[in-house]
Amino acid sequence: MKAFGKSLSVLCLAWLLALAGSVGGASSALAAAPKITLPGKNVDAATTAKLPSKAVPPPKPVLVPPAGNLVIIGGGLRADNAEVWQRIVSLAGGKGARIAVFGMASVNPEKSGQSIINKLNQYGAQAFFVPLGVTLPNSDYRKAAEDPEIVALIHSATGIYFAGGDQARITQALVRQNGHRTAALEAIWDVYRDGGVIAGSSAGAAIMSTTMFYDAKPVLDMLKMGVNDGKEIAPGLGFIGDDVFVDQHLLVRGRFARMIPVMLKKGYQIGLGIDENSAMVVDSRRDVEIIGYSGALLIDLSSAITDRGVKGFNISNAAISYLDRGDKFNLVTRAFTPSPDKADNKLDPNQPDMREPVFTNDILGNNAVLDLMGNLIDNAQQEAIGIAFGNPRDPYPDLGFEFRFSKTVNSVGYSSTEAEAYSVLKLRLDIRPIQLQQPLYRYK
């Protein structure tokens, strides 16, 4: 599989370069290593080539899409979640597949890595530990990341697994101080380009987009005080591409709300947030399939606007969807395919199951947004409201936020014939700041 993927990539690249003409010395896509600026690191100006002031910019290198797959896990993956574990092993080549396990996000990489190895091997893999990590005892992680033996070890794999922990440790170990990829990271990309699978859970999911959460504040504080490069967010490794933002632990921790200010700041139109014990499988055609226990939220800001005249974070006309297990979504065409148990059970807006108003006073609570969306899509009501506010002792205790969800002509729902579950597409979402009375309540 690796040889075939590599040959196909080279042939595609040669054909595209022939059509484009001479590239004037532009780097090959397979060798290109975009610079990543790490928080708190100053890149030497000498590492950046300068063009003459009147030079014609060189053509961009032709990018060949990776032939592999991503398995983006929302954290909390149980050992008995056979659907996810088996999919990772299958995408790596099936029984006996060699999967390189990186425990570098953990304080104890070896312990974390061995736990993952045991689970992968239980499902038929031949997983092995890669001795690379900032916190790995008696090891220089910078030398290890350039070590030819470690690079060869990675190249011997058809799958990669990043365990959970602190995602900053992953990028610190795999990205040079000048912002370029280490030899180990290039080898990981080679596995992916040649048709292998990259899986990651929690912190291992956070690194999948070009921007990741770094030292993030609580969700509500992020809405109140904003996000800053090098603090709340930093560069990720970008396996999913530069047009999709990824987050994890989503429904359990109400993290959908923190995705939106980051997407606005960094210019993302599409964001995907996956819940715990669940995974998004992204293939080379950019089809996303939801597997596991729960689902994912899809946030679309392509038509969203903000009002600069309003003091505080706000957004109007965002679109939010819930993709349940078994659902599929294409990141290129934006086409949605419901799971087989929902395919013939599209909700009729003229025959809603519920009629009562939908409201929650804790929209950031565990699964609160999913419950609200499911109640609204099968309801005679046209909108639902959730609010978020903090502890009276928190910063800005009188500042809260209203989340208004409303149905539009594009809103669609599907109901499962096998379980009490919904897929919900394209609800409108407006968020605006509200002022809370202080104290919030009084004794009688």
Language-model region placement:
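C-terminal and late-domain segments of enzyme folds
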Residues: 34-96, 107-114, 120-122, 134, ...
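Catalytic nucleophile loop
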Residues: 161-164, 187-188, 192-213
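Boundary at the C-terminal end of the N-terminal hydrophobic targeting segment
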Residues: 25-32
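Glycine/threonine-rich flexible loop motifs
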Residues: 167-181
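Functional beta-strand-loop-alpha-helix junction segments that form "active/interaction loops"
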Residues: 106, 112-115, 122-151
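Catalytic-core regions built around general acid/base machinery
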Residues: 149-153, 180-195
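Bacterial N-terminal signal peptides
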Residues: 10-24
